[in-house]
Structure formats: C-alpha cells, structure tokens
C-alpha cells in the first residue's frame, strides 16, 4: 500500500484529471509523462506492486541476493511516484457504473472505490492464449508466463524437468530463464516451423532488435542442447495428482502420439491476447481481428478509443511487445497534454515517436509471420480435441458437450453454446477457454465465425464484474442499509 | 518443518536471502521474504491447492497472473485469495482446500 487514502464507510469517491488502469510498461509510461506535466493522475493495479507483466518487480530480498532482472522497470516506477501520481496497488477495477463513466474498484482491504476522471487510460495488458488438451487441468501444467514470473521475480523453479510447448517467440526466453536456474528443459514443442533451416539462421536475417534477441536466445538453447521439436503439439498430459508425463504429436496429425517425455512441470502457451473487457464495458467500439479471433479496440493513432475520453494503450490495444506498449502509453499522454493545452510535444519528437512506432509494428508483423496464426492453429487443433477433454476448466465442461450443443440447440451460436453448457461462465470469465470454445463451435458449424466475414466473427461478450468481487465489497458499496438487513 | 534449504536442487537455493516463516496447512514453511505465495507453494512442490467445485479434481496455479483463479487459497481467514498475486509476510497463515471427494473417473 502506497497511497494515503481512508477507507470510507461505503464507496470512497476519487476524482482526477486522469485515471489509468494498469501499472505495466504502458500505464507507467503514460503516468510518468502526465503527472510530471502537472495533471492529477491516479494509476491502479490489482497486483501488490506496479510493473505489470514485463516489469514485474522481484521482492527486495530476491533483488539483493540474485539481482534485479529489469532495473529499468524499477526506475520507471520511481519516476511515476516522484512525479506525484497517486499509485493504488491491490486495487481491482471490476466494473463500470450505470452512468458509463464511473469505474468501480475494490481496494486491498476489499473496500469499494469509485473513480471518475476527465480522461480514462486503459492499460490492462494481455493474458496468455491457451488451448486445452487432455490433462491440462492437472497441477503442474501451467502457462509459460507463470514459469517466467517464478524464475525472474521469485527465483523459484517451476519444476526440475520441464517441457515447454505451444507457439511463439516467448517460449525461447522462458526456456533460457529456466536453464539459468538449473532446470532441465527436456525440449520445446513449437506448433509451427519458424526456425528454418535452423535456429541459428535467425541471426543472419539481418533484422535488428527483436529478431536478434530471438537469435541470442536460440544460441543459448543450442549451447544447452535443448531440442526444439517443430510442428509439434501436446497430445495429452498424464499423472495422478500432478503431471508426470507429456505426450507429443505432429501438428499435422494431432491425434497420433510421436513421443512421451517424463516431466514434473509442463508449460503451454500460444502467445498473448489483449485484455479488453473494461474498454468494452465502457462502450468503446471493438473489432474482431480475423487472423487471431481476438477483440481489439478501435483506436486512433494516439490510442484514443471511439469514446473521446477513453484511451486504450499497451497490449490491451493489440499485442506488440514491451517497446510498443511504452510507445503507445507515451503517445496517449502526449495527446492528452495537447488537448489540455499543456506543453505540446515538439514536432520533431512527435515525428520520431511516429516512426519508432511504425518500425516496431513492422518488427511485430515480421516475427508474427514466422509463427502460425491463431486462426490457423484453431482450425487444426479444435477438430482433433478428444471428446472427453475438459475445455472449460472452471465449470468442467468437456469438448463433446460443447460440440453437441453447438451443432444442436445452440445452432452454431457461440453465446448460446456458452449459456447452454456453462463453458466460459466461471470465475475466469472464459479467458482460459474462450479461444478453444470459439474454435469448437466453428469446427462443427463451419459456416459461422472467422473466415466468413468480420460481421460473423464471434467472441464472448464482456460481462460485469470482470473478476469475481468479494461479497464484502458489494455489501459495502450498497450502503449500510443492506448490511443491516444481512446481519 | 520443511525448509527451502532442504529443497535446494529442486528449486534454486535460497542462499543467504532473508527468510520468512509462514504456516501452510499447519506446517511451518521457510521462504525468501516477500516473494509470491504461489512461488513459495510451488517451490515446496505443493501444487494442489484446491478442488474444482464441479468435477472435484485437484487444481493448482496455472496462469500466474491473476486470471484463472486456480490458485485460490485462504489467507489469515480470508478465502478466495489468489496466491499468484499475493506476497508473503511473516506469520501469514495459509489454508489450502484439497480435502474431499476424489474426482470421478477421468
Ligand atoms: C504472464 C505474462 C508474462 C509475460 N512476460 C514477458 C516477458 O518476460 N518478456 C516480454 O517481453 N513480454 C512478456 N509478456 C508480454 C507483456 O504483456 C508485455 O511485454 C508488456 O508487459 C505489456 O505491457 P502493458 O503495459 O501493455 O501490460 P501489462 O504489463 O500486462 O500490465 C497490465 C497491468 O494491468 C493490470 N490490470 C489488468 N486488468 C486490471 C483490472 N481490471 N484492475 C486492475 N488492474 C488491472 C494488471 O495487473 C497488469 O499489472 C508477458 C505477458 C504475460 C501475460
Ligand atoms: S494462477 Fe491463475 S489466478 Fe493465480
């Protein structure tokens, strides 16, 4: 807890020039600029510390003992605090009031907080794209991001012998982090064939920044003799109370086993998806990206959404990596300052920023093109998913039930399928199963969804609250009367 | 009592980093001060934290970023605390909820 604020009996109300949701690279970049220009800024994050995913802070004891893996994150946070931004950690923003502009949050003691601002900046980041397989709900099966956080900020290993699987460039740095801690990485299963003819060839492509970074990870993995199985996917995970082996298959024939590997942890992810629920709840227009099947807010160059008082920045506005996230945060800050008539950005700086963002976008497109697109992945993985696979982890809904319902009573409609089966209705709000459920529905009703024109692309709608809210918060928000009645 | 020292090799050794003691299901557990509760539990290889309310099968941390709710435990009497976005402090009392029905055949 950093900011001074009293917990009012019910519904503390905060009014600011700017409220920023999300304290990752994007939100922090915006906050530093806006607060140092003199605006009253509040930045909220549900995590106990600012930093978001990329700048997740190690505990001080870890940093002292093993070093800080990303000291620039610490400096950016210090800059935000020094500039006078009010930093509210442990604050979950879970909804929007009926007026369409008041954010509803709960603080670290579960007290309700209402926030209003002339400008709202949504910097809620991304979450990992996962796809189910039999046994993915076993303890010891995680996302690669979890393994990365354990290694980088908690200096803890996810397992002793680990397989990483899924797709995308992120698997490589995670494998490197694990190796550094002495974990045996038994192999990396990559669904695509991005590394041609070999991993090392990446370095010769001559593209700076992201590809060179990838090449350096690749070199480290080669030195550690970590095999990379390309065009390979997870067929299933086995184990009693915890994962003990993983069976892999060729991506082209995802039902036929090719290799079983003993592991004590398995980390599977297919990149990231933007977290757009608050933007949608605020009535901002979103479009569905046909290639990924993800909802992406419609924004102008500076991140301005279809509502003029709302900005969406960072990975919440589309996946692009940390540099793009920071550039988008800054661009939004500059746009707000210009509208406020404060310290307009010099033309030369604005031009530099524009070209930097274009360059970043090109790199993202380039790296993306190396890996299979999410829609293509779904088309191969969804039809092959065994009938009894638990697809919705929260509500324990299996593939067969989703297929039967989608083809039957739901008539190919994603939301009807959700309502009938309860898939996507649990506490994670479909963030973990949404991608797969959409794919399953589409696989039995190929006439619907992606590939059939944008108007027919379907995703789960945003629902209030974005995360389960403690009952105590709701009672307090409703006022003393409701609590009396309850007692 | 289990100590992190005893797990060196299974997880990166704690070295000289300051340790804190917390209590997990009645067991005293030593871990590096201020790391995430999920890290302490996974470092101890205590993966199972709860049972799925529908299927009854054991679950453990999955996303590590507050999204999946698979890491919910009770902390100092407060239920539904996500271990992955909670830092440990001295004397923290943690209860998992792994008792109960074994899962039906799967
Ligand atoms: C688990 C994980 C690990 C990652 N690790 C790496 C890595 O090692 N290297 C790399 O290059 N990229 C990594 N990424 C990609 C990463 O998303 C970007 O590089 C970068 O962090 C994006 O910055 P951002 O500011 O857009 O969002 P984020 O850094 O994701 O920050 C968003 C913040 O918003 C907060 N938030 C979201 N919704 C709410 C809400 N409703 N109420 C309150 N707070 C909220 C979150 O707690 C989070 O702190 C990782 C992503 C994930 C999901
Ligand atoms: S591991 Fe997913 S919420 Fe904690």
Task: Enumerate the predicted regions with their spans.
Chain A
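Residues forming the flavin
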Residues: 2-421, 425-427, 431-487
């Amino acid at each position: 807890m950093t900011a001074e604020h009293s917990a009012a009996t019910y519904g503390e109300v905060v009014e600011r020039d700017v409220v920023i949701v999300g304290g990752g690279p994007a939100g922090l970049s915006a906050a530093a600029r806006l607060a140092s220009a003199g605006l009253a800024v509040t930045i909220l994050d549900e995590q106990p510390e600012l930093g978001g995913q990329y700048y997740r802070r190690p505990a001080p004891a870890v940093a002292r003992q093993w070093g800080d893996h990303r000291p620039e994150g610490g400096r950016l946070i210090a800059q935000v605090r020094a500039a006078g931004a009010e930093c509210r950690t442990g604050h979950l923003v879970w909804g929007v009031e009926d007026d369409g502009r008041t954010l509803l949050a709960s603080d670290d003691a579960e007290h309700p907080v209402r926030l209003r601002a002339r400008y709202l900046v949504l910097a809620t980041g991304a979450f990992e794209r996962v796809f189910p397989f039999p046994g993915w709900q076993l303890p010891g099966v995680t996302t690669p991001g979890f393994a990365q956080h354990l290694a980088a900020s908690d200096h803890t290993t996810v397992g002793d012998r680990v397989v990483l699987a899924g797709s995308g460039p992120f698997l490589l740095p995670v494998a490197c982090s694990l190796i550094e801690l002495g974990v045996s990485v038994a192999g990396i299963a990559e669904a695509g064939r991005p590394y041609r003819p070999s991993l090392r060839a990446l370095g010769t492509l001559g593209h700076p920044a992201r590809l060179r970074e990838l090449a350096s990870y690749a070199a480290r993995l080669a030195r550690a003799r970590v095999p990379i199985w390309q065009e390979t996917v997870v067929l299933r995970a086995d184990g009693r109370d915890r994962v003990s082996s993983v069976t892999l298959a060729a991506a082209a024939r995802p039902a036929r086993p090719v290799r079983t590997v003993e592991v004590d942890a398995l980390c599977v992810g297919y990149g990231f998806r933007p977290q757009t629920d608050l933007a949608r709840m605020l009535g901002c227009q979103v479009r569905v990206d046909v290639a990924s099947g993800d909802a992406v807010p419609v924004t102008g160059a500076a991140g301005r959404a279809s509502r003029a008082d709302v900005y969406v920045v960072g990975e919440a506005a589309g996946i692009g990596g940390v540099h793009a996230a920071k550039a988008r945060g800054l661009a939004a800050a500059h746009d707000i300052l210009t509208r406020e008539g404060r310290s307009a950005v010099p033309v030369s700086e604005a031009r530099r920023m524009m070209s930097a963002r274009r360059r970043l976008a090109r790199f993202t497109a380039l790296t993306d093109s190396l890996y299979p697109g999410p829609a293509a992945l779904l088309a191969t993985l969804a039809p092959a998913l065994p009938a009894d696979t638990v697809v919705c982890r929260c509500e324990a809904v299996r593939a067969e039930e989703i297929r039967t319902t989608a083809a039957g009573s739901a008539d190919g409609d994603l939301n009807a399928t959700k309502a009938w089966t309860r898939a996507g209705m649990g506490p994670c709000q479909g963030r973990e199963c949404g991608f797969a459920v959409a794919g399953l529905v589409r696989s039995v009703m190929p006439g619907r969804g992606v590939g059939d024109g944008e108007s027919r692309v379907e995703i789960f709608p945003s629902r209030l609250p974005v995360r389960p809210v403690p009952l105590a918060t709701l009672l307090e928000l409703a006022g003393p009367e409701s609590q009396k009645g309850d007692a | 009592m289990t100590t992190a020292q005893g797990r060196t090799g299974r997880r990166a050794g704690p070295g000289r980093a300051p340790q804190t003691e917390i209590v997990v299901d009645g067991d005293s557990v030593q871990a590096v001060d201020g790391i995430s509760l999920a890290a302490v539990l996974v470092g101890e290889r205590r993966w199972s934290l709860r049972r799925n309310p529908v299927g009854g099968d054991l679950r453990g941390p999955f996303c590590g970023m507050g999204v999946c709710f698979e890491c919910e435990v009770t902390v100092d009497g407060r239920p539904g605390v996500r271990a992955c976005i909670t830092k440990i402090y001295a004397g923290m009392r943690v209860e998992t909820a792994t008792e109960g029905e074994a899962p039906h055949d799967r």
